[in-house]
Curated annotation (Swiss-Prot):
Disulfide bonds: none
UniProt-recorded name of the protein: Ribosome maturation factor RimP
Any Pfam family matching the protein: RimP_N
Species annotation: Caulobacter sp. (strain K31)
Keyword Kinase (UniProt): no
Gene of this entry: rimP
């Protein structure tokens, strides 16, 4: 699901080791457009789930080098590297576990329970099957093999926004603690010194 076409899948296989070598995971890759205006769109993240502008630039440089050397795409194209965003696609089995409890839209490659498209709350993963509590149907949980899923995306809700804000706050807090630990015992003195310079 990280790649949609055979060409996408081949590019994922080529670029996965490059992304991992610089500390990122490819969430989704799509080669879009016609022969004249192609666009290679890559969504990626760090293992902690974050991805800022500097991360995108770093990964873009690493990917560009291998694409220039291997030349797997015929003709001209534009490379776009971005974060998956808040209402992100879910493309790996672990995503369905990580985001359990949140609202999601899922599309299957076949009919199940009389339809291909579903909306509901993720119920996690059990034996390689993705669980979904169906919207508007009390106590109805359905399970699909991960391989049946062709598209899945989180639904933008207040709960999702709150969770995203909490995760960002936790990361910022952890980064601040790491910075103070790196400074050692002089951390408070350094802060006091900089404050006195502003007066």
């Amino acid at each position: 699901m990280r790649g949609k076409t055979q060409e996408d899948i081949g590019l994922v296989e080529l670029l996965d080791p490059v992304a991992e070598s610089v500390g990122y995971e490819i969430v989704r890759l799509r080669l879009m457009g016609g022969a004249e205006q192609r666009r290679l769109q890559i969504m990626a993240e760090r293992p902690d789930g974050d991805m800022n502008v500097e991360d995108c630039a770093k990964l873009s440089r690493a990917i560009s080098e291998i694409l220039d050397a291997a030349d797997p795409i015929s003709g001209e194209y534009t490379l776009e590297v971005s974060s998956p965003g808040v209402d992100r696609p879910l493309t790996r089995l672990k995503d369905f576990e990580t985001y359990a409890g949140l609202e999601v839209r899922i599309e299957l490659d076949r009919v199940a329970e009389g339809r291909k498209r579903f909306k509901g709350e993720l119920a996690g993963v059990e034996d390689g099957q993705v669980g979904l509590n169906l919207e508007g149907e009390d106590d109805t949980t359905v399970y699909f093999p991960f391989e049946w899923i062709v598209d899945a995306k989180l639904v933008l809700t207040d709960q999702l926004m709150k969770r995203g804000a909490e995760q960002r706050a936790a990361r910022v807090g952890a980064e601040g603690e790491d910075a103070n630990e790196d400074l050692g015992d002089d951390a408070e003195d350094d802060i006091d010194l900089s404050e006195s310079e502003e007066d």
